[in-house]
């Protein structure tokens, strides 16, 4: 009875509970190793996803492998190419030349080049302008008046005219801004640029016998530098491939370890079930033996009584008589 109670007390854990516990432990370990990246995001169920590629990633160990993949690199390059034109400054478009603007600019330049007139010439110009205005107004005099007026005009100081006092003193008017169209500016830029035939890059490869000098003149890497750069790129690619393979191997090892643990748990559960079956069989065998013993005990008690009665009957008879022991 004590063994049966002990067997009932040891209960086997259900397989579903063990699977649930294993999933919770895996989920907790995944939560602890969160990926810190602007493109990494987690769903409501805790699944790691790439926001740039919109693709799920199994776990944090494979995030570096996904980042080094071709799909992620192409998406990142496409994003950079889309965002780059937004920051480039737009070329300034200026209006084209007009004939009126060209003529006005040439006249202002000529006026600026001429020397300022002398004071005597300035007075003569002022008096001449005043006389012209008087004739236009209709003031006509005789010849004598003209002569006397001429003498008086020679001695009289110059009077104010219709022109402003600082007409000739003021400098030349500022030239209007000359506008250029986009095509003109482009043409000027093309003229300012050096023609391709005069550039060092236009020289053919192997123009100089010395490969180092040839590379320096053409402003390219020397063969040694090129080999070193290619070697560094090769090593970088190999490191990336090795890191990706290490991540895959680590993931495979983790999955294999979890599978082995699940197999061991299932094997333990089968062993527990077998132990329980054997204990149940043992209990049934014991109960049968007890019942058989209980049935055999009264029969064993009756047999000694019969033997004693026969012995007493024999002893009471005359053993010397004929046929007494028959």
UniProtKB/Swiss-Prot annotation:
Compositional bias ranges of the Acidic residues kind: 298-309
Where it sits in the cell: the answer is: Nucleus; Chromosome; Nucleus speckle
Q: Where is the composition biased (Basic and acidic residues)?
A: 13-36, 276-286
Sequence ranges of Basic residues compositional bias: 1-11
Map out region (Disordered) in residue numbers: 1-37, 83-214, 237-257, 276-309
Q: Where is the composition biased (Low complexity)?
A: 83-108
Q: Which InterPro entries match?
A: Matrin/U1-like-C_Znf_C2H2, ZNF830-like, Znf_C2H2_jaz, Znf_C2H2_sf
Q: Which UniProt keywords apply?
A: Cell cycle, Cell division, Chromosome, Coiled coil, Developmental protein, Metal-binding, Mitosis, Nucleus, Zinc, Zinc-finger
Q: Where is the composition biased (Polar residues)?
A: 180-195
Q: Where are the zinc fingers (C2H2-type)?
A: 50-72
Q: Does the keyword Signal apply?
A: no
Task: Please provide the Gene Ontology terms (biological process) for this protein.
Answer: cell division; mitotic DNA damage checkpoint signaling; mitotic DNA replication checkpoint signaling; nuclear DNA replication
Q: According to its record, what are the GO cellular component terms? A: chromosome; nuclear speck; nucleus; spliceosomal complex
State one molecular function term (GO).
zinc ion binding
Protein name per the record:
Zinc finger protein 830
Species whose genome carries this gene? Danio rerio (Zebrafish)
Q: Which gene encodes it?
A: znf830
